[in-house]
Design a protein with these regions (language model features):
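Extreme N-terminal leader/targeting segments of oxidoreductases
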Residues: 1-26, 44
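Conserved N-terminal/central alpha/beta ligand/cofactor-binding core
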Residues: 2-8, 15, 54-213
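Generic low-complexity segments that are intrinsically disordered, proline-rich and/or Lys/Arg-biased
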Residues: 18-20, 48, 134
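N-terminal Rossmann-like FAD-binding beta1-loop-alpha1 element of flavoenzymes
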Residues: 26-51
Length: 213
């Protein structure tokens, strides 16, 4: 089992991993989105954090699932001209999940606050996906887009040698067997040879020697 002490603090808070110690304030098991968020928040509060991962690379399921999050009525929706409200979300969740009302209300009350905190205290940046319907678009309270947020691509070379520690996306999300692409690149790649704009976009992707995730 591999472990990285304060790994999230290094990447997100600009700190270097601390030496292994005998005691920690917070121990996080798993390096997916939930684990990394927990570690980053604890580190931002000056807690000594140990992040433990059983795999040889970090990222968990999040790394192979696109890294998107579902945050209803988020403050970023206005960037793409969309609007939402918690009452509509509440109706949608009441028709789709069987979780307790208490947990649902906690999610509704704090999910947007959570992403605000992460963007303020870490280098994570998210953007709304305008056309990404809820899984059950015909149910009451569903929307056709905006609730899903995706991470803004960044230059993977900033991680240096630690880039190799990241779990790779699925092959379907990579070009030429190893070049990572974003969701917005896919329509352009499908139109190569049919659209000058898309062809130029694809050529820039290939010519770009940066690693991006």
């Amino acid at each position: 089992m591999d472990s990285w002490s304060d790994y999230s603090a290094k990447r997100w808070l600009g700190l270097r991993p601390a030496p292994m110690r005998d005691r920690y304030d917070v121990i996080v098991v798993g390096s997916g989105a939930a684990g990394l968020c927990a570690a980053a928040v604890a580190a931002s509060q000056s807690q000594a954090v140990l992040l433990v991962e059983s795999a040889s690379q970090i990222g968990g399921t999040t790394a192979i699932s696109g890294g998107m999050v579902w945050v209803p009525a988020n403050h970023k929706m206005k960037e793409v001209g969309l609007d939402d409200n918690l009452e509509a979300t509440r109706r949608y969740l009441q028709h789709t999940v069987t979780d307790s009302d208490e947990r649902m209300e906690a999610f509704l009350a704090t999910s947007d606050e959570a992403i605000r905190y992460l963007e303020q205290h870490t280098s994570l940046k998210l953007r709304p996906v305008k056309r990404y319907p809820d899984y059950y678009p015909d149910l009451p309270g569903a929307t056709l887009g905006g609730r899903v947020l995706e991470p803004v691509p960044f230059d993977g070379s900033e991680l240096g040698a630690d880039f190799s520690r990241l779990r790779w996306p699925l092959p379907e999300f990579m070009l030429f067997g190893g070049m990572m692409i974003s969701r917005e690149d896919i329509p352009h790649l499908r139109r190569v040879g049919q659209s000058l704009q898309s062809t130029m976009h694809a050529l820039k992707l290939v010519a770009n020697t940066r690693n991006s995730v």
